[in-house]
């Protein structure tokens, strides 16, 4: 009888993840027993501290490559770079929530640990090299977001958004599990490396190939829902509009980042030899996503819904890098785009929160009328974010789109790069429309927005980062290049 073998475990490789999970768990207890109502901001500050500590413990791990838990989790510079991006997203999202929650009358201490648990799910997706781990990561992220989406209870729009997200998310989870079952039935493994080796072998039969392709299709459908690729995007505008604005901001970048990180692993390590099957499908979904997202945004007069459709379009641009993951430039474009998009989009949502303090209807395009005369610095910051999201030089968004389009062109998808160029031109219309309202329209009696300390820090960091990366992109380029030296090794 074979003895039970315990796989080797190197917890050092999981240091940032363990810090986030442990800190969030302890913080839940501390909040319940030691932090009274009315002082829940302290829980938020402690959560920010935990995310900062998680980032710091990752610094000595730069350049370290290894697997743990029997090869189910992998630390490499790619995963570590994404971990730092995810921690930054969590910090900025919590910072913009500190005054928003009490202002809306929904301040609850568990909000901040939930954000931390969501970040832990994103980190798990970046490090996972096993389909079971990827499922755990995406469900950890999703379940926390179901709760956070309905956090504005008893506001009906928030409850409706949470219910829609929960039902459709459960549907996507079913696809994921069924896909894992088919892939395991075809290959006998859930490890991405072993799946890739089996798919590359000449001994794979027609039946197993059919099962493998069917399972891969199921998993890709699940990821498409999480990323909001068309036609799996229909939930996005309603869920973003009904969610508390900081939650919508977090979802717009966090869900995409985590799911696409796992998708890069899956395509690059698990299915590289089957790209003749999945590449045309993903290319079609990407083109449709860019078209639907940007055309949908043009028709919006609600800026929050416009940013939701904008996030759909940007999912298509990020996919340009993901699809050519077999080429060095593809994952580089993905990492660079995720960082730039996170800064620009979180900054834009922070401006929305500054206006939202004046009432529930502060998302209309008319609410931006004459903003430059009422709050000049806020208008300038929003203009920076809009120019960046539109891809206008010298903002960082221009370099990100250029990098992604170049990756698609050099990766053998020139037609898709051209679709990206055309849809970027369409996108410029609705971004510039916001800028025109702020600078070239007279105020119509709207109150002057007030900026609290948290929002000021968020907006300032995002604006400075957007400009700095646009003007001096070389250091960030160097970082992402070093992050991919050992990807898939």
Curated annotation (Swiss-Prot):
It is an enzyme of class 7 (translocase). Its EC number is 7.1.1.-. The chain crosses the membrane at residues 15-35, 44-64, 78-98, 106-126, 131-151, 166-186, 209-229, 244-264, 278-298, 306-326, 333-353, 378-398, 412-432, 459-479. Pfam families: Proton_antipo_M (PF00361). This is NADH-quinone oxidoreductase subunit N. Belongs to the complex I subunit 2 family. NDH-1 is composed of 14 different subunits. Subunits NuoA, H, J, K, L, M, N constitute the membrane sector of the complex. GO terms for biological process: ATP synthesis coupled electron transport. One of its GO terms (molecular function) is quinone binding. The keyword S-adenosyl-L-methionine does not apply. One of its GO terms (cellular component) is plasma membrane. It catalyses: a quinone + NADH + 5 H(+)(in) = a quinol + NAD(+) + 4 H(+)(out). It comes from Chloroflexus aggregans (strain MD-66 / DSM 9485). Keywords: Cell membrane, Membrane, NAD, Quinone, Translocase, Transmembrane, Transmembrane helix, Transport, Ubiquinone. It is found in: Cell membrane.
